[in-house]
């Protein structure tokens, strides 16, 4: 059976914000498939690695299914690759959340707990700042776009050339990374109304696909009306 129709592969390793990501791509007219099949991942036009919860548990589940190698191979082949939330953190080498656990190591630095003098977790709507002027990831997004965050860890030590955006939560935190075919979003674009859909549409475009205009999509997802972005973070938990 030919499964090549799965143009974007969302890596299913038993943990993560899977269906929400799939529905978000569908909202911009892009077909995405939840899969743990390495052959499907290898032939996809783009690969998405979601993640929620604990870095060590996520990496353990990925390794157990031999999907860490599938992710490495996809990146090495030049397939567009997007890590979301813990999926972005898994692109790094290590995390203080799980000493001894080894990440994918695409970015050779550590993920650390947010400073003790800030509210943890960083949860709710916040604005991305310091957008890289040549960022394809944030193409078409207005200055300081609102995105939805839920995280307690972030990488404080990232090569500035790879930083696509930052966010201020008591301190400046890396909100997104962009390096060649690899993107990482610390926030949840699939939970971030039309601005998040714009970012996913940008990703689909890099995959050679033709997404629909995100402004025509209904991206409410229970958190905000489309195009309405609160001035203060929303205190609510994402249920995945």
Task: For each feature predicted by the language model, list its residue ranges.
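Beta-strand-turn-beta hairpins that frame and shape the catalytic cleft
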Residues: 144, 178-183
């Amino acid at each position: 059976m030919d499964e090549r129709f799965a143009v974007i592969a969302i890596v299913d390793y038993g943990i993560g914000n899977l269906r929400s990501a799939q529905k978000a791509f569908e909202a911009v007219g892009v077909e995405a498939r939840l899969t743990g099949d390495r052959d499907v991942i290898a032939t996809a036009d783009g690969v998405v690695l979601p993640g929620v919860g604990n870095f060590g548990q996520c990496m353990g589940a990925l390794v157990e299914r031999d999907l860490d190698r599938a992710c490495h191979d996809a990146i090495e082949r030049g397939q567009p690759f997007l890590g979301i939330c813990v999926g972005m953190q898994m692109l790094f080498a290590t995390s203080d959340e799980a000493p001894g656990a080894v990440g994918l190591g695409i970015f050779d630095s550590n993920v650390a707990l947010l400073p003790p003098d800030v509210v943890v977790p960083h949860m709710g709507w916040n604005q991305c700042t310091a957008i890289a002027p040549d960022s394809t990831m944030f193409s078409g997004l207005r200055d300081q776009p609102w995105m939805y965050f839920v995280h307690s860890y972030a990488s404080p030590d990232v090569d500035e050339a790879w930083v696509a955006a930052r966010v201020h939560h008591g301190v400046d935190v890396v909100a997104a990374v962009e390096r060649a075919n690899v993107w990482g979003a610390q926030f949840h674009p699939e939970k971030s109304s039309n601005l998040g859909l714009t970012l996913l549409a940008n990703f689909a475009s890099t995959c050679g696909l033709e997404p629909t205009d995100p402004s025509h999509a209904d991206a409410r997802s229970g958190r905000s009306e489309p195009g309405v972005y609160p001035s203060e973070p929303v205190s609510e938990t994402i249920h995945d």
